[in-house]
């Protein structure tokens, strides 16, 4: 029997931290509790160790299992990876047993290319959203996978805002974002010497390798040395279906604690941004609103979120630190 390198969220649980990493084990646990988690799979910490043993390559057996599990995700979601008409878009995140600085940041909206964006923008009737997703993906992939500094892209965004006479990213139109995506790809080609990858499988493998590589980067190594974390642990990789907080004003994203982190007093503490994606809340691109204001904007999602918090606190018997997205008024839990 071949070794199992990949687990669906529905196949894991909170006890499997060593194999699935903290994030993966908790996503599995939330899935088992019946909470609204966008589905996906975790590539194990053992696959990371194997990647280094194989001279920093992903061997055929692991590669085969990853693609097999993409197939399972396609069945669950009814979407197809790399399909123009109904594309499966995913996020890729690292997840070690213990949370660590220096580990790879998230990549969102993976699976997009120019053709897919054109169809998405037409089908969704929301071209601004489609191009926003694409320019964010190019930006993150370039930064995280290829190590092209964020600043080059931020400068291009600032120039575009100046040209259009606006101050906020959200004020840029679909055409502005489309133009930015083109500028980003030109920047990528200039820095890397090849075209930005259009094949979703190539994008996915690039992102997974970047997570494995980040286990061995200088920041991670220093942190491990200082905190007695063995090198042999490796990191897991979580591949998850996207939930979109940036599709309009009935969408958003947030982070919250079930208690005040300073005093431990019970009550929701956190921040929320409408029409935004994950990193916007922490990146300080816009000023977020207090989590309590979410109740006015999204009463149903907020009521459900409060219920989820109750379930998680009583289940884990501990304060929870959560990330979530609201897509067209529907709540999705991304992490606890």
Show which residues each predicted segment covers.
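Nucleotide/phosphate-binding sheet-loop regions of phosphoryl- and nucleotidyl-transfer enzymes
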Residues: 1-336
């Amino acid at each position: 029997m071949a070794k199992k390198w990949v687990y669906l969220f529905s196949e894991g649980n909170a006890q499997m931290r060593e194999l699935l990493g903290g994030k993966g084990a908790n996503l599995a646990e939330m899935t088992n509790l019946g909470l609204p988690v966008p589905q996906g799979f975790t590539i194990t910490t053992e696959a990371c160790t194997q990647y280094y043993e194989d001279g920093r390559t992903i061997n055929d057996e692991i590669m085969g299992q990853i693609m097999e599990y993409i197939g399972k995700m396609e069945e669950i979601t009814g979407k197809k990876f790399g399909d123009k008409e109904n594309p499966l878009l995913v996020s890729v995140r690292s997840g070690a047993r213990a949370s660590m600085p220096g580990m790879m940041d998230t990549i969102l909206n993976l699976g997009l290319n120019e053709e897919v964006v054109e169809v998405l923008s037409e089908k969704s009737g929301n071209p601004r959203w489609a191009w926003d997703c694409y320019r964010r993906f190019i930006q993150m992939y370039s930064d995280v996978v290829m190590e092209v500094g964020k600043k080059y892209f931020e400068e291009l965004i600032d120039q575009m805002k100046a040209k259009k006479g606006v101050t906020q990213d959200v004020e840029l139109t679909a055409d502005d974002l489309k133009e930015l995506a083109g500028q980003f790809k030109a920047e990528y080609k200039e820095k890397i010497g090849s075209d930005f990858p259009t094949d979703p499988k190539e994008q996915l493998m690039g992102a997974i390798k970047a997570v494995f590589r980040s286990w061995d980067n200088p920041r991670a190594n220093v942190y491990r040395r200082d905190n007695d974390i063995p090198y042999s642990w490796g990191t897991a990789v979580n591949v998850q279906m996207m939930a979109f907080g940036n599709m309009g004003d009935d969408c958003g994203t947030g982070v919250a604690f079930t208690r005040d982190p300073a005093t431990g007093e019970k009550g929701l503490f956190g921040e929320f941004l409408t029409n935004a994606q994950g990193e916007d809340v922490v990146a300080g691109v816009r000023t977020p609103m207090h989590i309590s204001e979410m109740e006015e904007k999204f009463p149903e999602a907020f009521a459900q979120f409060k219920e989820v918090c109750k379930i998680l606190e009583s289940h884990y018997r501990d304060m929870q630190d959560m990330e979530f997205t609201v897509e067209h008024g529907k709540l999705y839990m991304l992490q606890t």
